[in-house]
């Protein structure tokens, strides 16, 4: 296990974060190339919604369990090497799909892409929450959430602007290789300027550090006590709902409103995705000043989601504009809840568990995407959009119940472990 180090040089820390932000936005864009192109692929008759969804579903089905392994690796190995593996491997996968659009080959290549990317996010989160200058860590956790929002937007913008949807994969491949080259240059420079952490587990966001010797800091014990395993289904629901709306909104609107073409659907979806910024800003304003409990904040957002998601059952009956606003509200709330889970994860950096927790959280979110990509798409194919949206509503209600169970566990845990 490498010695824990961090940057004191604030300029270098800021420069490293800016690179990581751009790199992660591009990675998130490339992970969603199929989602961005779904409306065009379906409209051209190349694949059905469920076939396109299956490619994304298999990606996340393999990606999800490997997130736990990736989280453990991020806590033990050099994060830059794990990131390089992800960037280069993903660049190769995107280029192969640009060259050959055989359905089964795409399915295999995209599955291998999920393997090489498995440690990428935990490694990114490890750098932000443990290796940046102390002053940049909490802000870094906040601003990195915008990278995924803009990355997904770029996926739909490029899909709408490209003359052929295959070109999206070519551009993705080129950018991933460029990011890999920059990573190989920038991180070693930053690493040479890092200083060793103080004795004991790495400090996360604060200068003070308490680590009573009688506490059981084994991962499984800590995660069981804090209610992490009960919270994972909530993260699954968030991933399913949030990315489900983002990925399926163009097709949903296209099939529910005659005035919406694939191109119009993609452009409308850009506004829906960008609304997530409002939700993240809202959470930043209330945390930690008004709500300093991450799980309670999560509960508040999911409670608000219940009536908002219920309104989606009126799709096709309500005019287009109100429905787009409703979808925007859902994305704002799900992105806000995602920021609460990021703050929740950072708490564990105090005990050197932040990479592992990030892996579990990302694993759960990935399972949600699996269910959305194939399961919900299949429900929409067989029984229509109302049935698929009813599934979203049921999951939100179940999530509220689970959060209520976790709240007292988390409160007790944070007191016991001085978080």
Q: What do the PLM-derived regions correspond to, one by one?
A:
Residues 34-38, 226-281:
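Extracytoplasmic gate region of multi-pass secondary transporters
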Residues 348-383:
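A late C-terminal transmembrane helix in Major Facilitator Superfamily
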Residues 66-78, 279-293, 380:
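Helix-to-loop junctions at the C-terminal end of transmembrane segments
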Residues 2-10, 194-231:
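Juxtamembrane intracellular "pre-TM" segments in multi-pass secondary transporters
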Residues 143-192:
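Helix-loop-helix hairpin linking two adjacent transmembrane segments in secondary transporters
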Residues 65-101:
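Conserved MFS/SLC helix-loop-helix module at the cytosolic interface between two early adjacent transmembrane helices
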Residues 109-147:
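Cytoplasmic helix-loop-helix junction between adjacent transmembrane helices
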Residues 293-340:
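C-terminal transmembrane helical hairpin of 12-TM major facilitator-type secondary transporters
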